[in-house]
Regions:
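A bilobed periplasmic-binding-protein/Venus flytrap-type ligand-binding module shared by bacterial periplasmic
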Residues: 46-47, 130-141, 245-263
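N-terminal secretory signal peptides and thylakoid transit peptides that target proteins
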Residues: 1-14
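An extracytoplasmic/periplasmic, membrane-proximal ligand-sensing/linker region
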Residues: 25-45, 49-60, 225, 256-319
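Hydrophobic residues within well-ordered alpha-helices
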Residues: 88-89, 147, 199-200
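Pocket-lining segment of extracytoplasmic ligand-binding domains
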Residues: 153, 157-261
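Extracytoplasmic small-molecule ligand-binding "clamshell" domains
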Residues: 28-104
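Beta->alpha turn/N-cap motifs
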Residues: 77-81, 92-110, 119-120, 192, ...
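A conserved helix-loop-strand patch within extracytoplasmic ligand-binding domains
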Residues: 119-163, 167-179
Length: 319
């Protein structure tokens, strides 16, 4: 069982709040006054999955939002996390569903012009996930110690689970995550899904990704990249072995640009809080698995990720 200590990143102040969507109803369909300022809802999709699958996964969600608010929804399909971060900084997006580290980066890059609205609540009532290091089941590597002298693939430099969290925790353990130190080599595979594929194709010995850590391991757990790939029949969990798990990490937030109208932000939050009950299939597809719903959050909950980014920048300056 995965430990869920309150010292986990971002969870100390948040705790385990109640399920916020149980008594929520979907906003009544109709055009809003805020549509004069937001005539198109521009939404960013983080990288890490191929474009066709990303668009198919959110198609029902996009159509429902358009029908509810009666304005077009334009999707920005970014090649990587940085694409969405930079689009927020350039005021080219209204909203995106982000990782916690990507939110922190967007907040820093935009001068504080983003606000977190809500995070996923898992089936056990928690609001966290774990970063995991995995290898091929036939690799003979069964522990983090077995990765010494082996190659490791990171997912994305702006990913919490795929880069920042493991690097931080490895340093705490006395493991230098830089290339040619503990690991023989490291590199970026181009996203979470691409990292799994690279490991399965023996381009790297191990890789990093995220999972809820809950539910049946054979199905890729209840939520996360592994679950998504199992559902798409891209992965059989019998071919993969998880050899290390991080401390629990606060789930990434649904994010909105701070400069948008308050009524728009309130409608967007209400839409998402009601989504799991009103449209469970659309919710599961959008949220990459079977979470329980959404819980409101505030910027202070993500302060640890801003601190981590600043520490990572300091490490780069010392190289």
């Amino acid at each position: 069982m995965i430990s869920r200590r309150l010292t986990a990143l971002g969870l100390a102040s948040l705790g385990f709040p109640r399920f916020a969507g149980a008594n929520e109803t979907m906003p009544v369909p109709g055009k809003r006054a805020w549509a004069e300022q937001v005539p198109v809802i521009r939404m960013g999709l983080l990288g890490g999955e191929n474009d066709a699958d990303r668009l198919a996964r959110v198609d029902g969600y996009k159509k429902l939002m358009e029908a509810t608010f009666q304005v077009p929804v334009k999707l920005l399909v970014a090649a990587d996390y940085a694409g969405v971060i930079q689009a927020f900084a350039a005021k080219q997006l209204e909203t995106a569903y982000m990782s916690p580290a990507a939110y922190a980066s967007a907040w820093m890059e935009s001068g504080g012009d983003v606000v977190p609205l809500a995070v996923t609540q898992e089936q056990d009532g928690s609001t966290s996930y774990v970063s995991v290091l995995y290898t091929r089941a036939d690799s003979g590597i069964t522990s983090l110690e077995g990765m010494k002298g082996r190659s490791l693939a990171w997912a994305d430099p702006n990913s919490a689970s795929g880069y920042l969290i493991p690097r931080s925790e490895f340093r705490e353990m006395g493991i230098d995550p830089e290339p040619n130190k503990y690991f023989s080599r490291t590199g970026f595979a181009g996203g979470h899904e691409q990292t799994v594929v690279a490991v399965m194709n023996k381009q790297y010995d191990g890789g990093m990704t995220w999972t809820s850590g809950l539910g049946d391991p054979a199905t890729g757990y209840s939520r996360g990249v592994l679950r998504m790939m199992v559902d798409k029949k891209m992965l059989d969990m019998k071919d993969l072995r998880i050899i290390w798990k991080s401390r629990p990490v606060l789930n990434g937030p649904l994010t909105v640009r701070k400069g948008t109208p308050a009524a728009f932000q309130a409608d967007l939050l209400a839409f998402h809080l009601a989504l799991p009950i009103a449209h469970p299939d659309i919710y599961r597809s959008f949220d990459m698995g079977s979470g329980k719903g959404w819980v409101p959050v505030k910027h202070e909950d993500f302060r640890p990720f801003i601190d981590m980014l600043q520490q990572e920048a300091a490490q780069r300056r010392r190289r």
